[in-house]
């Protein structure tokens, strides 16, 4: 495979809250000199503008509120970018659940145990609310897309790694 062909393949990086998906996406974007799109920044911006905290108890409440309003639009934007552009790394919770294993997208899903995720978030206020946030995301993704976000069999079916 030549260099031009490799640049046509995009990366989709996903993972459970606190898994390190954003960190991995930024590292890969730097190493492979690719544009990095962090979908979480859209939600963080909206949350700040609407008076929700990015961390702690407000985060699960905001996720539950905002997903129904803009979730599908943002998810469809993510799919469009991955399937129609080149040389991208996209960090989004559930993109590969929707597009599956696609020849244009190499998808990675990070699924560390809950204790590991809590350790990673130990310095953040949101650590104590990760269980609640997991439940909210699981419910919202199931309602919006029929995605079983914490089902490891589904994760393995839909992601390359």
Residue spans of the language-model regions?
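Small-molecule kinase domains that catalyze NTP-dependent phosphoryl transfer to phosphate-bearing small molecules
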Residues: 127-161
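Walker A/P-loop
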Residues: 22
């Amino acid at each position: 495979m030549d260099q031009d062909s490799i640049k046509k393949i995009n990366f989709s990086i996903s993972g459970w809250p606190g898994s390190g998906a954003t960190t991995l996406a930024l590292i890969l974007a730097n190493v492979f000199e690719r544009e990095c799109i962090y979908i979480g920044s859209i939600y963080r911006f909206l949350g700040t503008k609407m008076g929700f905290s990015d961390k702690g108890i407000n985060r699960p409440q905001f996720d539950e509120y905002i997903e129904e309003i803009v979730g599908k639009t943002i998810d469809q934007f993510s799919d469009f970018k991955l399937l129609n552009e080149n040389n991208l790394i996209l960090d989004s919770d559930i993109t590969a659940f929707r597009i599956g294993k696609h020849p244009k997208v190499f998808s990675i899903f990070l699924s560390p145990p809950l204790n590991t995720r809590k350790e990673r978030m130990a310095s953040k206020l949101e650590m104590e609310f990760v269980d609640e946030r997991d439940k909210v995301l699981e419910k919202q993704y199931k309602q919006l897309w029929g995605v079983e976000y914490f089902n490891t069999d589904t994760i393995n079916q839909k992601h390359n790694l």
